[in-house]
UniProtKB/Swiss-Prot annotation:
Protein name (record): Nucleoside diphosphate kinase
SMART domains cross-referenced by the UniProt entry: NDK (SM00562)
Swiss-Prot/TrEMBL cofactor(s): Mg(2+)
Annotated function: Major role in the synthesis of nucleoside triphosphates other than ATP. The ATP gamma phosphate is transferred to the NDP beta phosphate via a ping-pong mechanism, using a phosphorylated active-site intermediate.
Catalysis performed (reactions): a 2'-deoxyribonucleoside 5'-diphosphate + ATP = a 2'-deoxyribonucleoside 5'-triphosphate + ADP; a ribonucleoside 5'-diphosphate + ATP = a ribonucleoside 5'-triphosphate + ADP
């Protein structure tokens, strides 16, 4: 199995409801290690930059408004097949379709406020990690 790193966001809705610890517990219980984490309140410019690939889509303005509505947690997770493992823990993007026991089934209210984001591939994970973290901020977990 390949040890990978992936990028994760706990979105404003889940932060506001004090679900950070419960979500971190899900990550760690699944064998993912948190190698970097910080709380941020995104500016409009930061949110627009992060979600630039969606800038022509109809939901872009609402997405930027939501992601700037309160603090978020950004973290880098490391583990075996981390990208896929993290996405499985998150569940379907629409919480109404998410399997019971997944983060979105348990903590999200709607497809628009769906508690968390996870990278969809190694390439996007590398890009998203670099957007929020310098190499020096990543702390390998050797113990």
């Amino acid at each position: 199995m390949a040890i990978e790193r992936t990028f994760s966001i706990i979105k404003p809705d889940a932060v506001a409801k004090n679900h950070i610890g419960a979500i971190y517990n899900r990550f760690e219980t699944a064998g993912l290690k948190i190698v970097a984490a910080k709380m941020l309140h995104l500016t409009k410019e930061q949110a627009e930059g992060f979600y630039a690939e969606h800038s022509e889509r109809g939901f872009f303005g609402a997405l930027v408004a939501f992601m700037t509505s309160g603090p978020i947690m950004v973290q880098v997770l490391e583990g075996e097949n981390a990208v896929l493992a993290h996405r499985e823990i998150l569940g379907a993007t629409n919480p109404a379709q998410a399997a019971p026991g997944t983060i979105r089934a348990d903590f999200a209210e709607s497809i628009d406020e769906n508690a968390a984001h996870g990278s969809d591939a190694l390439e996007s994970a590398a890009r998203e990690i670099a957007y929020f973290f310098s190499a020096e901020e990543l702390c390998p977990r050797t113990r």
